[in-house]
């Protein structure tokens, strides 16, 4: 026995030494060589486990804002083509339409807003004979015409009226943007009731016209100053502090009651996922006066494109605090826009943002900012735009941006009434950066290489959208289904069906968006 031990002890020692060395090398690779880890995670094959029994939020749909461009599209020779691309079944089939109640920058002779796309006609106009302001619903005619055309295609079931600023005659500085004292709202308290009456009167007009107006959003991005610099004076906007927000909502509730109007409030459309968003959501949700007239809570997911922890944190909070009212991500675009109009990079960011907002943030709907935007020429002489469509000044020429197809991967396959279900990956491909702040380690960047979300449709299909920011790899599925149809978008081909047959492992192309429909 002693001889055996004499032989075994050195052998075990050698094996332990080798094991420690290997583990040490592996540790060094994983924890010190970040580039190696990221490279491996961006090329590793993926297996998704999709569990239709783990259900989340029901989907109310997808949409875009008509702000800044519908009045241009409404007088363009390409009006019908643009409308069909966005709001018909042949196009994106969007069902949510955000109509901007303009603050009158196109009517105000003293405005500093010079861009004709950003100027708005108001329904509240000066009668030069009487010297009084009155309502004229023949105004904003081109934007109304475009809305009517989009409604005629039958996809829209939700119209949201939103205002970036009160009418310029109601503001402190007589402008549609904030005053120099950024911490003071440009809407004085004595005009809250007048502003509420103005909004609800306009809503009543659209409802009587037969437009399916569900919500009115009186406040938009109250976080920002909208006037301290000349940059902020280039578009309509208004700062509000917390008490301002709550009192404006109360004024709107009072007006809705008086008019006995079948409409609810949305908002307050925080411009980012930050601490104010939580404060505003919680107050509006729990206020006994406002709550019965609150139809949905709305926010914008700007400045979190690579801060997935913000989206996860919001989703966890909503799950705990907001139990019986819809939450909508009501505005996002690529900001600042660094992707070319025809680049897959813009589409990947668009799709990744949509997938993560839907998968992690516990929302019921997702709405893009501008459906159409102008074309900007960068310092490199190339064309940039954050719109789903991009065109020249009068939209006599336009093109479909690559990010349009990103939206199509969701809106054309996931109908209203679908329910989010659980999707798990077999790889940990997170990139995370932490910094020390006030003695604590704080996450400043967090993102995945492969992002995905799945829905169970009303007719029993499972739809999964996968966004691959990495290299070509294999993807396999564990799902209660027998057949699947697969559609991909890459730089070379958009919305191309690449497979139809039994559920199987397939190739996930590099830098691609993939929609899989399981049956």
Regions found by a protein language model. Name each.
Residues 480-494:
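Solvent-exposed beta-hairpin/edge-strand motifs
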Residues 41-214, 218, 236-241, 246, ...:
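N-terminal catalytic cores of secreted or lumenal carbohydrate-active enzymes
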């Amino acid at each position: 026995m002693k001889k055996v031990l004499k032989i075994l002890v050195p052998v075990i020692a050698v094996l332990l030494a080798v094991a420690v060395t290997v583990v040490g090398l592996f540790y060094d690779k994983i924890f010190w060589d970040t580039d190696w880890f990221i490279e491996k995670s961006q090329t590793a094959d993926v297996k998704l486990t999709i569990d239709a029994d783990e259900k989340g939020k029901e989907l109310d749909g997808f949409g875009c804002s008509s702000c800044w461009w519908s009045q241009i599209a409404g007088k363009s020779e390409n009006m019908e083509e643009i409308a069909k691309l966005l709001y018909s079944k042949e196009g994106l089939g969007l069902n949510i339409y955000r109509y901007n109640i303009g603050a009158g920058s196109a009517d105000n002779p003293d405005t500093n807003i010079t861009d004709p796309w950003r100027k708005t006609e108001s329904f509240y106009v000066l009668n030069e004979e009487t010297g009084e302001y009155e309502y004229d619903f023949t105004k904003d005619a081109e934007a109304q015409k475009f809305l009517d055309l989009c409604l005629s295609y039958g996809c829209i079931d939700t119209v949201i009226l939103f205002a970036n600023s009160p009418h310029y005659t109601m503001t402190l500085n007589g402008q549609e943007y904030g005053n120099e004292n950024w911490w003071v709202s440009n809407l004085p308290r004595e005009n809250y009731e007048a502003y509420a009456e103005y909004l609800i009167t306009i809503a009543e007009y659209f409802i009587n016209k037969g437009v399916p107006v569900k919500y009115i959003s009186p406040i938009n991005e109250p976080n920002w100053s909208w006037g301290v610099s000349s940059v902020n004076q280039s578009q309509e906007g208004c700062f509000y502090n917390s008490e301002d927000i709550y009192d404006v909502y109360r004024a709107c509730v009072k007006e809705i009651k008086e008019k006995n109007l079948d409409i609810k409030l949305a908002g307050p459309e925080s411009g980012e996922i930050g601490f104010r968003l939580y404060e505003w959501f919680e107050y509006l949700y729990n206020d006994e006066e406002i709550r019965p007239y609150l139809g949905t809570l709305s926010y914008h997911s700007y400045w979190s494109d690579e801060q997935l922890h913000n989206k996860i944190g919001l989703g966890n909070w909503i799950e705990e605090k907001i139990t019986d009212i819809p939450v909508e991500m009501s505005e996002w675009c690529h900001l600042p826009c660094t992707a070319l109009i025809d680049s897959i990079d813009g589409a990947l960011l668009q799709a990744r943002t949509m997938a993560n907002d839907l998968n992690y943030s516990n929302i019921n709907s997702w709405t893009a900012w501008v459906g159409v935007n102008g074309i900007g020429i960068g310092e490199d002489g190339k064309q940039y735009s954050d719109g789903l469509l991009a065109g020249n000044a009068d939209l006599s020429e336009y093109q479909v941006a690559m990010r349009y197809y990103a939206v199509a991967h969701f809106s054309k396959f996931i109908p209203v009434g679908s329910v989010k279900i659980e999707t798990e990956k077999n790889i940990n491909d997170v990139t995370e950066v932490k910094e020390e702040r006030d003695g604590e380690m704080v996450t400043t960047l967090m993102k995945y290489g492969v992002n995905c979300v799945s829905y169970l449709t009303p007719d029993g299909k499972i739809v999964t959208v996968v966004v691959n920011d990495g290299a070509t790899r294999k993807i396999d599925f564990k799902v209660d289904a027998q057949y699947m149809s697969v559609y991909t978008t890459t730089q070379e081909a958009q919305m191309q069906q690449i497979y139809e047959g039994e559920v199987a492992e397939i190739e996930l192309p590099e830098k691609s968006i993939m929609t899989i429909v399981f049956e």
